[in-house]
Structure formats: C-alpha cells, structure tokens
Swiss-Prot record:
Lineage: Archaea, Thermoproteota, Thermoprotei, Thermofilales, Thermofilaceae
Name this polypeptide is given: Large ribosomal subunit protein eL24
Residues annotated to bind Zn(2+): C7, C10, C33, C37
GO terms for cellular component: ribonucleoprotein complex; ribosome
Gene name, Swiss-Prot/TrEMBL: rpl24e
Subunit: Part of the 50S ribosomal subunit. Forms a cluster with proteins L3 and L14.
Family that this chain belongs to: Belongs to the eukaryotic ribosomal protein eL24 family.
Gene3D superfamilies from the UniProt entry: Ribosomal protein L24e
Length: 63
C-alpha cells in the first residue's frame, strides 16, 4: 500500500507520484505538493507560519 506523505512547507497530503522531491546534500528528502510551496521554501526562504494560505499554521505565542 503506498503511503501518503505530507508537504514540508504547507503540510497538505501528497499522493504517490505527485509533487516535487528535493534532496539536500546531507541526504534528507523534502517533499513539496506544488511549485508554489517549493519556491516559497527553497528560493524565497519564507516562513510557513507567516503565509495565510498555508494549512499548518501555528498559533502565535500566547504567554
């Protein structure tokens, strides 16, 4: 049974055979659901918590 992986940027599920796999020099594999997530993470170094369209937003500090 193929397993579902999740996007490293937005956290949405990725079906087998879809998305972009990015392998870093140290061997870690980052999977992205779309080119939008890939470019935001790799090219622009954006923080996913600051993007309104990202699903895996974390609540800001409530201290």
């Amino acid at each position: 049974m193929p397993r579902i992986v999740y996007c490293a940027f937005c956290g949405s599920p990725i079906k087998p055979g879809e998305g972009i796999s990015y392998v870093k020099n140290d061997g870690t594999v980052l999977r992205y659901c779309s080119s939008k997530c890939f470019k935001s993470a790799i090219k622009y170094h954006r923080d996913p918590r600051r993007q309104k369209w990202v699903r895996k937003q974390v609540a800001h500090g409530s201290s």
